[in-house]
Regions:
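DNA/chromatin major-groove-contacting recognition/catalytic segments
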Residues: 47-62, 132-149
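C-terminal catalytic core of Y-nucleophile DNA break-rejoin enzymes
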Residues: 41-81
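Catalytic-site neighborhood detector that most strongly recognizes the C-terminal catalytic loop/helix
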Residues: 40-44, 119, 123-144
Length: 149
């Protein structure tokens, strides 16, 4: 059961970009319509984030999600076990979900300023780290055109 719940938390974070501390503090009361509203633990700022279809499917699929809490280290230990079971040989921690959300958002055409708000960053420099990663990917892929001409 803990594997299923922890995987649910992880996948929810890949769809919303929430920090592990914020996911851990959520209860079903934080969800209204298509939004999740909460006070960010790190910044103490109120946040209200729209949930996409996949995020809503994740919370609707698992009724115990956000009812059971785990220590951060336990979550990361369980993620390692899940990756081993799935034969994924990567060092995956919960923060990877947030990183995945950020880079996916930018690759899909999202704006850095919007991402800053979604991630709850108080300084745009924090968000620009993700923009630089996406730009580096784009720069490396420009050489794919060499084979066409």
């Amino acid at each position: 059961e803990s594997h299923r719940l922890i995987l649910g938390y992880f996948l929810f974070s890949t769809m919303t970009g929430l920090r592990i501390s914020d996911v851990q503090n959520l209860t079903r009361k934080n969800f209204m319509d298509n939004y999740v509203s909460f006070v960010a633990k790190k910044t103490k700022l109120d946040q209200s984030i729209a949930m996409n279809k996949k995020a809503r499917e994740i919370i609707n699929h698992e009724p115990l999600l956000f009812e059971k809490k785990f220590a951060d280290q336990h979550i990361n230990d369980e993620l390692k076990k899940i990756m081993t079971l799935l034969k994924i040989h990567k060092n995956v921690t919960f923060h990877v979900a947030r990183h995945t959300f950020a880079t996916s958002f930018l690759r899909a055409g999202g704006k850095v300023e919007k991402l800053q708000r979604l991630l709850g960053h108080t300084d745009i420099k924090q968000t620009m780290i993700y923009a630089h990663i996406v730009q580096a990917d784009a720069n490396s892929e420009i050489f794919l055109l060499d084979d066409l001409f």
